[in-house]
Amino acid sequence: ISDTLHKHLPDDFQSAAQILVDALGPEPATDSLSGFDGFIVMPQCLFISRYGLDDFVTSINALYEMTKRFTAEGDIRTFIEKYPSKTMTFLHTLTQDESPFARRLASEGTRPRLPLFSRLPEFQRDPLPVIKILEKLKSDPNLMVRRSVANNLNDIAKDNPDIVVETLERWQKSAPSKEMDWIIAHALRSLLKEGHPSALNLMGYNPDVKISVSEINLSNDAPAIGEEIEFSFTVRSREDEPSKIMVDYLIYFMKANGKQTPKVFKAAKKNIAP
């Protein structure tokens, strides 16, 4: 669609961008992304990032208007790569914008490992510029924005786990709230699956808790495709005091190359007696 737009819009990029902006509908009445109505703006965002890279001001202003109707999270990355300083300055201003969609762009667009889009290796190496933006959004009143903050930190944790844990420890002390507790849990989800000791400790789990697992039973040790399997096991604490534990289990899935890869699932979160 963006290529077709290019065929029919004026060759002058500023004129073309203005036509696209003028054609945008009103900003959403709600403050969350839902449904598919906004997807019509997706090819327009792509047009800007594909054909407007040499006109920073026009492109950034157009993406700002478009992201308030959909999201320019993938397209802003093109400008982060070519104009890192100017684009990050712009994103910092968005953290104070009235539109939650614009504020979300500041976080979502800087995710080092944003799904469906190319990674930002400079932020994988050094996430501090991103964290400076997240600092301004950590107590945002909008859940959509806070979710983006947590997802961004989850991305960062895959390359810089200790920085994320240290950041969340600081936030927990400086801005304690139920909303912050939610951000911490959501941001640490990958590290918790890995059993990262500091992440477990931040969530209130003792990574060195002494437990035993026994009486493992399978209803079928060789299930065929389409069949169900039930399993059970017993977890006992060997501590002298009650312990908070989180129990996960792994299922290994066969990949096309013949190798198996594990996926972690949650079984239970319990307080168990000695």
Predicted feature locations:
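Active-site capping/gating regions of soluble enzymes
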Residues: 217-219, 230-231
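Surface-facing alpha-helical segments and adjacent helix-coil boundary elements at the starts of domains
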Residues: 1-198, 230, 241-246
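Non-catalytic, glycine-rich low-complexity segments
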Residues: 198-217
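A broad, structure-centric signal for solvent-exposed, well-ordered loop/edge residues
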Residues: 55, 220-225
